[in-house]
Design a protein with these regions (language model features):
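Bacterial N-terminal signal peptides that target proteins for export
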Residues: 2-12
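Bacterial N-terminal signal peptides
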Residues: 12-20
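Coiled-coil-like amphipathic alpha-helices with heptad-repeat character
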Residues: 5, 22-24
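Short hydrophobic alpha-helices and adjacent helix-cap/hinge residues
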Residues: 25-319
């Protein structure tokens, strides 16, 4: 009888022991520290400073838009604005910064204030920027000469002799122009100048020998006053002039040949990607592969040239 009375008690004791064991097991599990995730390092994006001077804000904006935010950390600096320049000391402290400079004033700031790699564009007189021992590379401000003369010949089939006047530091352009002219059956008559007034004198002296003139964007041997006199004299003496700036069309030039902003941007980006990947074999100067031809229709009519179907068109090199 006693055993029957103790049976419920034993059942309760066993149940309590089971519950205690389960609770204890859960406590031991809770006490086990959680597995910590293995930290992963986030790679730092290459830092780029885009320096630009007056007149190149749009090109700087185009370049910034062309650099993916997922690939580069970009800072833009207008070197002509004091408030914008204040960030330069901070940028100088970044050891792996790459500077892209647009225009000569910006390129000079990049050369003088930074020690790292520099890529410049929109600079014709670039020789002063190529500091020995520095990684400084540029994108040529002159579009391919062979493309220029081919388009000129299409527009003006009768052109046979083109004049070219350059300063001594750009004498290498003479051989390039002669090669480009030969491919289109055009002779190049060349002179070396040391000043703007000498350029005008040399041009007037060569006028009887030429029917076209190739102007290069060299402010060492050209000035606004000389450009006006030269273009006026050219028109009155039957010389068609190809210029480097669209604004000079209004002064009487026949046509302008300029690099496209899009191609210059692509070329700068390609050089930048090479630097970011450790490339060290790029040449000091890289030539663009695309140019835009703009025509002064009134001047074309004055010289009796065939009526063009368009006043502007883009030409690309075949690589």
């Amino acid at each position: 009888m006693q055993r029957r009375q103790d049976a419920p008690l034993r059942c309760c004791v066993i149940l309590l022991l089971v519950i205690s064991a389960v609770i204890g097991c859960n406590r031991r599990r809770a006490a086990t520290p959680p597995i910590q995730p293995v930290p992963t390092s986030v790679p730092l994006l290459p830092e780029v400073a885009i320096l630009f001077s007056n007149g190149y804000a749009a090109m700087a904006a185009d370049l910034r838009a062309a650099l993916p935010r997922t690939a580069y950390k970009v800072t833009s600096v207008d070197v002509d604005v004091d408030e914008s320049r204040r960030i330069i000391p901070t940028l100088r402290q970044k050891s792996k910064l790459v500077v892209v400079a647009i225009g000569l004033p910006a390129a000079r700031v990049a050369r003088d204030r930074f020690n790292g790699p520099v890529i410049f564009s929109q600079v014709f007189n670039y020789q002063e920027l190529l500091v020995s021992g520095r990684s400084i590379r540029g994108v040529s401000a002159m579009p391919p000469l062979d493309l220029q003369v081919k388009e000129w010949k299409k527009l003006d089939p009768k052109i046979q002799r083109i004049g070219l006047i350059v300063a001594e530091p750009h004498s290498e352009l003479i051989a390039q122009a002669e090669k480009a002219g030969k491919a289109s059956s055009v002779a190049v008559i060349h002179e070396i100048s040391s000043s703007d007034r000498e350029t005008l004198y040399l041009f007037k002296r060569m006028t009887p020998q030429i029917d076209g003139l190739w102007l290069v964007p060299d402010d060492q041997i050209l000035s606004p006053a000389v450009l006006r006199d030269l273009l006026s004299y050219a028109r009155s003496h039957g010389v068609r002039v190809c210029v480097f700036n669209d604004a000079l069309l209004e002064w009487g030039a026949l046509m302008s040949a300029t690099p496209t902003s899009a191609d210059t941007t692509r070329t700068v980006r390609r050089l930048l990607e090479g630097l970011s990947n450790g490339a060290t074999t790029a040449p000091n100067m890289t030539t663009v592969s695309e140019l835009v031809i703009r025509l002064n229709v009134d001047v074309a009519g004055h010289f009796g040239l065939p009526s063009p179907t368009r006043a502007a068109w883009v030409v690309r090199s075949v690589r």
